[in-house]
Amino acid sequence: PAKVATLKWQSLKDDSARLAAAIGGTVDVMEAVPASAQDQLKGAGWNVESKPGYGNPFLMFNTQKAPFDKPEVRRAILKAIDKQKLINSSLEGQAVEATSFLPEANPAYKKPSTDLSYDKDAASKLLSDAGVSGLEVNLVTTDHPWVLSLVPQIKSDLEALGLKVNHTQMASSDLYANVTDVDNPTYDIVLAPGDPS
C-alpha cells in the first residue's frame, strides 16, 4: 500500500527556481540536484544523495552531413573534449566519465572497443587523416542550465583543435521537433542531456 495519499509533480527546469522551492519548503524531493547547490541544500537540512544514473549528456552528430558522416571526424571531436576537466569544473566532480549510455554498474554494460578518452594529439591526427581542416561547427544545445554549463569548455576544447564553433540553445521540445527529428536535418552537432525532459 502507498505510504502517501497524493503526489504532486512540479516541473521546474530553472536551477534557481528549483533550489528556491526546495529551501522554501514547497517541494519535498528534488531530482538532479545541481552540484553547485548541494552544500546549500545540506545547510538547509536536506539529505542529498548521489547515485550513478543514466542522465549522461551526449553529442549527436548529423551523419547525413559531411564531414560528420566520417567516423574519424566524430571520434576526433569526442577525443578533443577533456571530459574529466568538464566533470571537475562544470560538474564540481559529481560525475564519472561515461564510456557508454549504461553506467558500469549496470549488468548489461560492456566496455567499448573504441577508446574515446581525451587525447588532443590523437584527435588532431584523426582530423588530418580524414582530410578535414578549418571546419566550422554549429553546436546546438538544449537550454538545461547544467548542459549550458558544459558549453564554454567544449567550445574551447574544439577551438583548440582548430575548429570554429558557433553555439545556439533552445528548449528540448523545439530542438527535437524542429532540428533533429525532421526529414532533412541541417544541424551539425547537438549537445543534450540523456533524459531530455
Feature-to-residue mapping (PLM):
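Beta->alpha turn/N-cap motifs
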Residues: 15, 31-37, 54, 83, ...
